[in-house]
Amino acid sequence: MATLIRLFIHPVKSMRGIGLTHALADVSGLAFDRIFMITEPDGTFITARQFPQMVRFTPSPVHDGLHLTAPDGSSAYVRFADFATQDAPTEVWGTHFTARIAPDAINKWLSGFFSREVQLRWVGPQMTRRVKRHNTVPLSFADGYPYLLANEASLRDLQQRCPASVKMEQFRPNLVVSGASAWEEDRWKVIRIGDVVFDVVKPCSRCIFTTVSPEKGQKHPAGEPLKTLQSFRTAQDNGDVDFGQNLIARNSGVIRVGDEVEILATAPAKIYGAAAADDTANITQQPDANVDIDWQGQAFRGNNQQVLLEQLENQGIRIPYSCRAGICGSCRVQLLEGEVTPLKKSAMGDDGTILCCSCVPKTALKLAR
C-alpha cells in the first residue's frame, strides 16, 4: 500500500521548503505553496537556477503575510495589506499574467543579497495565471503545475546509482509517497489521497536546479544528481530527464501525512534510457581575461571564465532557457564571429549555433538569435 509520508510547501519560489503534517489541497495547489516570488523590476521571474543561494532563505508564512530570514540571519516581514493594490505584469516561463509588488523597503533589503535590483511579488487575492492546456485550473508561481509528487523508492534507486549524496529536498516536491516500487509512479494516471482525487498529468522534467545543495546553496561541481539521471531517466520520445509526476487536483480537501495513496487508474509508462553517448568535452582552463561580446549590436565587456548565458543575463539581455544544463536547447543562439569553449560536445551545432548555458567565451564574440 502506498502512503503519503511527507508534505512540503515552498511559500517563496526557489527558497527553502517547509515540511507539514497536514495541508489544505486546493485545485490551485497546497495552501501557501509558491504564492510569493522574486522577480526583476520588469516582472521576469528569478530562481535558484541563476542564484543558488536563494535556497538558504527561510520563508515563514503567517496569517497576514510573510516573514523572511536571510542566510546571514537578518529578517524582514511584509503583510498582504502592504503589497501594491495595482496588478503588475509578471512572467514565468513565457506565460504572462499579473501579480502584486511588495513595498520598497523589503525589495531594497532583498536586493542587497543579489547582484541586481529585485522585487518580491505576491499572486494577489485572485490568481490570474492558468495551467497551460487547462484553462480552468488556477496556478501560483509554480513552474507549470499545482502539484509535484515524488516516490521515496525512486529516490533510493537514484541514490544507489549516484556517486553523490541525494536528498528529496533537491527535487522540491509537494507530496512524497512510500510503499510503492521504484518508478511505479510512471504508470499512475489517477490517484486519491484522503478525500482529494488527483489527475497525474505528466512526468516532471528536471534541470540544473536539482544539483543545488539545499544546505550550501551551491551547485554540485559534477552536476549530480542530474548527470546520473540522464544516464537512465532520459525519455526516449523527447529527451527530457524526468523525476516525479505533475498533478492537478479535481477537488479540495485536507490531506495528511499517513494518508493512503489509492491508485484509481494506470496507463503504460514512458520508455526511458540513457542520453546520447558521452557528451563531455575536453576542457582546458584559460587564464583570466576580458573579452568583448556583441549581442545583436549591443556591445559589452565580458570574461572567459563564466558561461555565456549568465554574462548575457547580467547585462539585462533575456535569453530563453529551461534546464540551464545543456539538455533542452532553449538557449541556442547564432555564433557569428569568435570562438567559445564548449562544456559539452552538443553545445556546438553544425549550423553555427551554440548553447549559451554550456559555452564559455574564448575570444571576442558576435552573437545573434
Curated annotation (Swiss-Prot):
GO terms for biological process: response to toxic substance; toxin catabolic process. One of its GO terms (molecular function) is pyridoxal phosphate binding. CDD domains: fer2. InterPro entries: 2Fe-2S_ferredoxin-like_sf (IPR036010), 2Fe-2S_ferredoxin-type (IPR001041), 2Fe2S_fd_BS (IPR006058), Beta-grasp_dom_sf (IPR012675), MoCF_Sase_C (IPR005302), MOCOS_middle (IPR005303), Pyrv_Knase-like_insert_dom_sf (IPR011037). SUPFAM superfamilies: 2Fe-2S ferredoxin-like, MOSC N-terminal domain-like, PK beta-barrel domain-like. Coiled coil: none annotated. It comes from the Bacteria. Disulfide bonds: none annotated. Residues 289-369 form the 2Fe-2S ferredoxin-type domain. Residues 115-264 form the MOSC domain. This is Uncharacterized protein YcbX. It comes from Escherichia coli (strain K12).
